[in-house]
Amino acid sequence: MPIRALCTICSDFFDHSRDVAAIHCGHTFHLQCLIQWFETAPSRTCPQCRIQVGKKTIINKLFFDLAQEEENVLDAEFLKNELDSVKAQLSQKDREKRDSQAIIDTLRDTLEERNATVESLQNALNKAEMLCSTLKKQMKFLEQRQDETKQAREEAHRLKCKMKTMEQIELLLQSQRSEVEEMIRDMGVGQSAVEQLAVYCVSLKKEYENLKEARKATGELADRLKKDLVSSRSKLKTLNTELDQAKLELRSAQKDLQSADQEITSLRKKLMILQGTLSLPPATNETVSRLVFESPAPVEMMNPRLHQPPFGDEIDLNTTFDVNTPPTQTSGSQHCLPKKLCLERARSPMQNVLKKVHKVSKPESQLSLGGQRCVGELDEELAGAFPLFIRNAVLGQKQPNRTTAESRCSTDVVRIGFDGLGGRTKFIQPRDTTIIRPVPVKSKAKSKQKVRIKTVSSASQPKLDTFLCQ
């Protein structure tokens, strides 16, 4: 078994790979560890017992005799020493690695700082270049402005000289002879004075020509204004004449308007009288029937006949048409239809008369001032609008007085009665029954006459078969 001794300095077991040294006190250490101890310690003492040690008292190397069979056997202490040395190396490597990693991190930080510095310097360089280009442009602009300023100064100096010359010319034009002579004397003698005098002479000549032209233009303007004044006076005279004529026309128009108002008033009164005259007063159906049958047949009720086509086209007689046959009617309705048509035709002139009466009663602004119509023309027009039986029965009577007609119109009564054609109608019944004189006929004779007239009228009316035969 090997000696299980260890070095108290490095705590490693003794082996044959390193030398073992001893001190005179008897303690043993690794030679390398003992030398390093003496170099680092403040005094040369034993690391274990602290006794003073001299250089001569140190045994540098001890020799141990080992057995032959034990040389090839691995010792646990040796392996432990190797393991400790490997661990120490590993820890050293780890420490070196950590130091290297710290150095690498430091270098990386330094590199990033340098990159940031380079980037900032690059940005600063770009800004400096932009600033330099801007300054160059500004310098160029300032040089241009300087040139413009120089030109402006020259122009200002030239204009100042010109203004001074103009002031002198103005003074020359406005001043008296003595002042002009004094100014000429102040000019002195020389080429510049001669040039100045020449300029003054040219300016005076131009001013004289301008004054001549202005005088000529002023004379022409005065002549034109005189002519305009004469023409304006003549126009004013004409307008005054026209104004007087217009005033006269206005007065005549006012007189015409007053006469038209009087005419409208008279026409309204006559219209009221005519409305009272045209009222049908009888309360019996016999008078209406008599007036209807006494009237001649209207033009529209003539016998129908075939006419020439309007456009001259030929008619194809072979063409067939679907004609809807009306239902058969009773004899009473067939007899009453023509009379009803006759009554409707007879009523149409009455409607036209009412329309004409409404036209007469329009506002005064629609009447023409110059075109007046007399009363007789209106009466003739109204009389021509009525059918013959109305004129014979009503208009043929004597015109009653205006006061009686107005009193009669105010006492008339509107009634509803039979119209003699199977229907009802409204009529105005006057209180004075002497307007229409009914024919004195007995009641039985009236009924017989009515039946006979109905048969005659129905027989005289055209039929469909006679129309087709024609």
Curated annotation (Swiss-Prot):
UniProt-listed InterPro entries: TRAIP_ubiq-protein_ligase, Znf_RING, Znf_RING/FYVE/PHD
GO BP of this protein: DNA damage response; negative regulation of interferon-beta production; negative regulation of tumor necrosis factor-mediated signaling pathway; protein ubiquitination; protein-DNA covalent cross-linking repair; replication fork processing; signal transduction
Coiled-coil intervals: 76-277
RING-type zinc-finger residues: 7-50
Pathway where it operates: Protein modification; protein ubiquitination
Superkingdom in the source lineage: Eukaryota
Protein name in the entry: E3 ubiquitin-protein ligase TRAIP
Organism classification: Eukaryota, Metazoa, Chordata, Craniata, Vertebrata
